Structures are given as C-alpha cells and as structure tokens.
Amino acid sequence: MNRRRRYTGSNPSLRRVLYRAHLGVALVAVFTAGLAVTLVGLLTLRAYADPNQQLIARSISYTVEAAVVFGDAQAAEESLALIASSEEVSSAIVYDRQGQTLASWHRESTGPLHLLEQQLAHWLLSAPTEQPILHDGQKIGSVEVKGSGGSLLRFLLTGFAGMVLCLLLTALGAFYLSRRLVRGIVGPLDQLAKVAHTVRRERDFEKRVPEAGIAELSQLGEDFNALLDELESWQARLQDENASLAHQAHHDSLTSLPNRAFFEGRLSRALRDANEHREQLAVLFIDSDRFKEINDRLGHAAGDTVLVNIAMRIRGQLRESDLVARLGGDEFAVLLAPLASGADALRIADNIIASMQAPIRLSDGSTVSTSLTIGIALYPEHADTPAALLHDADMAMYIAKRQARGSRRLAELNDPRILQEEKEIDSATPEAPPK
C-alpha cells in the first residue's frame, strides 16, 4: 500500500511564498515603471538636446563674428568661453575662413564621472553641431559645438536614486500589505491545521475551526467542521459498538452476567492481588438442582426465566466487590474478594441458598421452585491457581449434591473421603449427575 508523503519541513511555508510573491510583483512593477520612465526621459532629453545644441552654436557664431572678421583670436576665445561655460557643452571650436582653428574651449575633466559623461554623450547624443559664421551674407568661418553628457548623467543618477527609493518604499508597503493579507489567509489555515493536528494526535473530535474573514476560507472551515461532526458521530458509534462487542465477548447474553473467560481473568488478577497483600478469597461453584427437569417439562422459555432469576438472586446476596458469572448451562461461579475468613464464605453461600426458597414466577403466571447446591474453595487453604480453585469448588459442589441437594460444602484439603468420592465421580459415566 502506498504510504502518504509527509511534510518534511524542506518546503517553504505559505506565509513565505505569499511574502515573496507580493514583494516580487511589487518590485517588478516598480522596476518596470522606473525603467520605462527613464527611457522616455532619456529620449525626451535627446530630442531637446539637438535643437539646444544648434541654438548654442548659432549664439556662439553671432558672438564671435566680429572677432573672426578681424582675426582676433583672444577675443574669440573670451567670447567662446563666456557662452560655452554656462551651457551643456563639452567643447567648442571656432574655425576661420581657411578652416584653421582660431579659438577653442574644452570643459575641464574634473571628477570621476567625466568619462561616464563622455560615454553617455557618445551613445545618446548626435554628432557635433557645425554652424557657419556669416558676415554680409558671406561665410567667414564656422563653429563646431559638441554636447556634454552631464545632464543625461544627472538625470540617470537622479532617476536611479528615485527608483531605488521607490523600490524601498514599495518593499515596505508590500511587506505591510502582505502581512495583512497573510494574516487573513494563513491565519485561518493555521487554525485549520492546528485543529486537524489535534484531532489526529489526540482524537479530540470536539475541536472546531473558528470562522474566517474570507468567504472561501470560511466555507472551507464550515465544511471541515461538518466533517468533524460526522467523524465525531462516527467515533461515538464506533466506541458504542466496540463497547457492545466487548460486553458481548465477556458477558452472557441471557443473564447479562460475565462469562467464564471474564471470570477466569478476574480470578487471576484477584489471586495476584491476594498474594501481594496476603489476603484471602473464595470461589463458589453453584449448580441449579433439577434444572434439566424444569427445562424439559416446562420448556426452554421457562428454563431461561429460571436462569435469569437465579442470576438476580445470587447477585443480590453479594457485595459490590464480589463477582458472579455464568459458566454455562445452569452452572454459576462467584468470586468473593477480599475475604476476612472462611466463615464469611459459608455465610454468603447460606444466604444464596436461602434466597431460592421463594418460588420463581413464570411468564404464564405459574410458579416453579428450585434450589442451588454450592461448593466452596478458599485461597490459599485449598489451591493457589484459578484452575485448581474452580476444580476444588466444582468437586465440593458435586459431593454436596450427592449428599443433599440445596446444600453447600467446603472443600477439604487431603480429606480421604473427599478424595474417594472425587475418584468415584471421575470414574463415573459421562452422564451428568441428577439435578
């Protein structure tokens, strides 16, 4: 038969799975949104960078026009530096009519981010912008302006910092919302798991799952509680049936008295207790006189009524600690434990015999009388085992029945007369003695 796979603890819990899922979704969403915004921003900056670079080149061409006309390199450099230093320009060069460099300006490479700015400008900005310098409609030179990646780098760094901050805030928000959601989902599931574990380990079918705040989980809890109701009812019926079967296995169905197996087990325990506490006990072997005659003459129903009444009358003469059992047919056995003396056993036997003096009323209104013959064996005087005690009490009962029906007899240890009569009984025919 396939064994059910058990949880080993290596799998992640539902709580952790939900936390990871919520955090992952939130981070992916923020990262995707941040990346999209950054790309759109870069494209927008690039779209504005080209016209701005052309405006800067045109402004420089107007400013250095006079210096180019007169070939004044110093004035051209001063004008060039004045404009380029305040704009997003990495370099600017002024050429004369012959294409020779008249003036140039380059932004100083300060800081570790200069190379990164150059790389961004190379990747994202267009080629350097060239603007002719005109005088009276004639080209007298040109200006070459190369853009700087400083703005792009600042934008990227600001966007990255903002995205990291958003990711942190999103992670905190996702953790908080996940805890609330997990509390609503995992909490009821934990309760259900605890109840199921308690029911499985302790067989406590009275446990119930509390109502959840989510409809589906609440329905699951109701179905689980309904299942527990059925299991509790089934368990109760099973216990009742087991108790009934156990009672039937150890009790006589007619008289409801314990049977021979139950009596012998109880006698064995009583002997151990008596030996441990040095106490005395007695076994009474009881047989109904002329029961076969009553059963044959009046029928089995009358015989059953007689047996039930005998059981009730014997039980009525005993203490709560004593035990009476039906061994079979019309034979009964009584365990008297503890016992103060053998005289108490004789007195109880006399009371049982006396209880049978009143006639037994049958179902048809008629009455019938019977008597009981009792054999008594004492522990430890006569025997110290269950079988030996029952045997000695049985032998004493048969001897008493031969001598006088409706009497009682105490087994006697090593009594020659008892031994002789016991031999006669053992050698007699299998037919039971008259009752």
Curated annotation (Swiss-Prot):
Effect of residue 162 to S: No longer binds to YfiR
Pathway: Purine metabolism; 3',5'-cyclic di-GMP biosynthesis
TM segment ranges: 23-43, 155-175
Result of altering residue 330 to A: Produces a wild type colony morphology and an attachment level around 60% of wild type
Periplasmic side stretches: 44-154
Descriptive protein name: Diguanylate cyclase TpbB
Catalytic activity: 2 GTP = 3',3'-c-di-GMP + 2 diphosphate
Disulfide-linked positions: none
